[in-house]
């Protein structure tokens, strides 16, 4: 951990969320990870934001260094509660004020849910290769499709329980496809996989929730059209799944939006182009 980084205690009912804060000035930036990753997704981005804004990053319940209660309902709706707990702890540390919310991948639904409920707290909503509701151009990566499709997901999970080597190879292949730079891929994927193994129950439960979550949130399209704060849509243009069509759909729905398609970046846009992404975030 960097010497400037401070641990932020966050209680989530009886459980504990792991969160870190880097000091700075202005509205705090809240970085949220998706699946199947954790706060280390922002390791390359953080040095480019440090000192420019206060930055908090945290592991959702069930992930990384946060608690992992057994049989917990790990859903997008409950992740919005995780975000609310982090905001509450941040308010106690820094005082209540506007926030820059940064969502990537599966953190799109909880981040947008919270933003729609608390527009007065949002300085800027930043969307990095994420999703919220079903659209015709939204695609699931192969591993996510395997684990989220009813009927076949139970068989797939049974296989990887018996074959941990196959689980590791599938993870390495799929997450590796999200990173453009071979050197960074070689460093980051094993680090993420090490913390993924104990997070697998949360991963599978979120996959169970995935299709219903995106279908249900089509009911929020009207709320998205009425959302007042600025929205900055920053997508890696090489992402085949959460692709430029998804980005353009977000930009069309939110009335005060900017669209930035980053050439040379894929699904992990903050890993592929950290300086450019940090500059766009800090500008909000």
Feature map (PLM): residue ranges:
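Catalytic histidine-centered segment of alpha/beta-hydrolase-like enzymes
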Residues: 265-274
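Hydrophobic residues on the short alpha-helix immediately C-terminal to a glycine-rich phosphate/catalytic loop
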Residues: 45, 114, 280-284
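Alpha/beta-hydrolase fold catalytic core
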Residues: 1-29, 50-53, 87, 92-98, ...
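Flexible "cap/lid" subdomain of the alpha/beta-hydrolase fold that forms the substrate-access gate
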Residues: 3-5, 15-17, 41, 56, ...
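Active-site pre-Tyr helix/loop in NAD(P)-dependent dehydrogenases
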Residues: 35, 131, 256, 268
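Conserved HGGG/HGGXW glycine-rich cap/lid loop of the alpha/beta-hydrolase fold
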Residues: 21-67
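Conserved catalytic core of Hanks-type protein kinase domains
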Residues: 48, 253, 271
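Conserved acidic functional residues
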Residues: 34, 105, 271-272
């Amino acid at each position: 951990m960097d010497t400037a980084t401070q641990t932020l205690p966050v209680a989530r009912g009886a459980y504990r969320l792991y969160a870190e804060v880097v000091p700075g000035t202005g509205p705090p930036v809240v970085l949220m990870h998706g699946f199947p990753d954790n706060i280390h997704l922002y390791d390359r981005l953080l040095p480019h934001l440090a000192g420019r804004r206060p930055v908090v990053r945290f592991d959702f319940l069930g992930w990384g260094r946060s608690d992992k209660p057994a049989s917990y309902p790990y859903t997008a709706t409950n992740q919005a509660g995780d975000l609310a707990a982090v905001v509450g702890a941040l308010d106690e540390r820094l005082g209540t004020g506007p926030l820059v919310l940064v969502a990537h991948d599966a953190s799109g639904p909880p981040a947008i849910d919270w933003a729609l409920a608390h527009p007065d707290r949002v300085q800027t909503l930043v969307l990095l290769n994420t999703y919220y509701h079903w659209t015709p151009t939204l695609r699931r990566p192969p591993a996510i499709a395997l684990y989220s499709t009813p009927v076949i997901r139970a068989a797939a999970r049974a296989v990887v329980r018996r074959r941990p080597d196959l689980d590791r190879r599938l993870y390495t292949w799929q997450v590796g496809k999200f990173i453009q730079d071979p050197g960074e891929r070689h460093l980051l994927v094993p680090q993420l996989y090490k913390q993924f193994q104990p997070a697998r129950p949360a991963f599978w439960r979120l996959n169970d929730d995935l299709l219903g979550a995106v279908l249900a949130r089509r009911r929020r399209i009207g709320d998205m059209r009425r959302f007042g704060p600025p929205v900055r849509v920053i997508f890696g243009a090489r992402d085949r799944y959460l692709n430029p069509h998804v980005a353009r759909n977000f930009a069309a729905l939110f009335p005060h939006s900017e669209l930035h398609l980053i050439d040379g970046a894929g699904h992990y846009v903050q890993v592929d182009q950290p300086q450019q992404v940090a500059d766009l975030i800090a500008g909000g």
